Amino acid sequence: MRAIRKYFQKYWKYKIQQTKEELNTMKIGNDIYYVGVNDHRVDLFEGQYVVPNGMSYNSYVIKDEKIAVMDTVDAGFTEEWLGKVAEVLDGAKPDYLVVQHMEPDHAANIENFMKAYPDTTVVANTKTFTMMENFFRGMDLEGKKHIVANGDTLTLGKHVLTFVFAPMVHWPEVMVTYDSTDKVLFSADGFGKFGALDVEEDWDCEARRYYIGIVGKYGPQVQKLLKAAATLDIQTICPLHGPILTENLGHYLEKYDIWSSYKVESEGVMIAYTSVYGHTKKAAELSCTEAGGKGLPEGCCLRSCKRRHGRGSGGCFPLRQAGIGQHYIQRRSIPVYAYIHREPDRT
């Protein structure tokens, strides 16, 4: 009952907040608008990553002689998103829907969008259209497809979009889009972070945790994308999750280079532990004291993981050294450490 009550309290808090922020859009540069949504109902992103500050699902509109909508949002926000798009369009009709990534939190509303704007042309690569046909069996895109190859361009007027394929960052069909006019990179899931946009928090921590959980296994693919990005004059990064990045872009690019090449970000050490009766905790505390006395530049971080496996693996990812103190149940690791032990297989 307590869990049910907590859910409904959170739900109604969300509904009140949603009403207050209804049709809240944001202009980026001269002709680009943010039309994304905040999700404060989600507790576990993708069913496993704790997101205490929710998530954002980002979408954008480019208004030029031709109008392009960049990606859709999660299925739980159809009406809110379509309302924001309509507000920005202000009676105009979109010419293109650009689909960079087919994961449902970004692609769920393709069919709903096409019902609202049936004359729109969908812009995507071949793999994306194959996925689309399987996702939306009843959707007819005959005569409404614009298939792009890597490096192809699309002219909207003064805005020229260049499509750069980024397979396995983190799905096989992913591509990013560069607007050479406003020098904006629409980066798909790259440079995303956990957290809704109406909550202010440090980028590095939640972006690192997002990267490890969602993209971390695909370091070589991210490195390839970074090399392509290095040839572009990028002044703004518009990801599909998290804030729009407009300042100090070198910092974000450097972080992605470190994470994707698995370099050491900090010389500290983390000791993660779980403890039933307190004995493992005491051992972990003693180990941390000993490690701290060794003159480590960044000291020692002690973390009780409990049920939040993403916190444990996220905490040790940037460090040179990590220790684990765990207890066993019937000769097996408890689930949180079984997860952390397998993390190298992912990253």
Segments and roles (model prediction):
Residues 22, 27-30, 67, 74, 124-247:
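Metallo-beta-lactamase
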Residues 76-123:
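Active-site metal-binding motif and surrounding structural segment of the metallo-beta-lactamase
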Residues 70-72, 94-102, 122-125, 185-188, ...:
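Active-site neighborhood of phospho(di)ester-bond hydrolases with catalytic His/Asp-centered motifs
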Residues 285-300:
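Short helix-loop-beta junction
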